[in-house]
A protein has these predicted regions:
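Cyclophilin-like peptidyl-prolyl cis-trans isomerases
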Residues: 2-219
Length: 219
């Protein structure tokens, strides 16, 4: 399962994904119009989708609206610095992978404040049936508003992501692929005030006030 683990001084986010496989990847070629990306099939999709294109063409900033059951979150995706992550995220959004899915976990400890979404199974263990490499600089930080990918270890990104609604200390192991408008974080802050059920052994649990994704669309 994907999980957030607290360690002294620094928090490490290990958001688990289902077991991976080693099937045929989707790849592209570097070119003037895009960036080559490789997506490796794992055969364990929580909801069936096609692999993303093997070439990322969204290589600039992309505006999206993350519509939740509790309000809209306007976000800017970093296609310029994390093109393969943004390519996957947009592909999943366009295929309806995220539509009508729960956000199964929230953490409310000061310094560790995130909402985890992107698993149609609602277990924090599901994914899209493929994984791909991290896009890290080594200098990642996770202030409020950060939009980042969950993982279960190096290069295991899939569909699950987390939104940081309060400044959070994590090791720089999680691809930061966008930011959520500060004004919209109140949607999550209100949910956080009601706490969680404490069922996740690594911290946090299901929000006591449920929240889920309705859709993700380009703005």
């Amino acid at each position: 399962m994907k999980r957030l683990l607290a360690v002294p001084a620094v928090l490490t986010l290990a958001l688990s994904l289902a077991a991976c496989g080693d099937d045929e990847p989707s790849t592209g070629s570097d070119g003037a119009d895009g960036v080559a990306c490789t997506y490796n099939e794992t055969g364990d999709a929580a909801r069936e989708v096609d692999l993303p294109p093997g070439e990322a063409t969204a290589t600039d900033k992309v505006e999206v609206v993350i519509t939740t059951t509790n309000g809209d979150l306007r976000a800017t995706l970093n296609g310029d610095t994390t093109p393969c992550t943004v390519n996957s995220f947009l592909s999943l959004a366009e295929q309806g992978f995220y539509d009508d899915t729960p956000c199964p976990r929230i953490t409310t400890t000061p310094g560790f404040e995130v909402l985890q979404c992107g698993d149609p199974s609602g277990t924090t263990a599901g994914g899209p049936g493929y994984q791909y490499e991290d896009e890290l600089s080594g200098g990642e930080t996770y202030p409020a508003g950060t939009l980042a990918m969950a993982n279960s270890g190096p290069d295991t990104q899939g569909s699950q992501f987390f939104i940081v609604y309060g400044d959070t200390q994590l090791r720089p192991d999680y691809t930061v692929f966008g930011t959520v408008d500060e004004a919209d974080l109140s949607v999550i802050e209100e949910i956080a005030q009601d706490g969680d059920d404490g069922t996740n052994p690594a911290g946090g649990g299901a929000p006591n006030t449920p929240i889920g994704l309705v859709s993700i669309t380009t703005d």
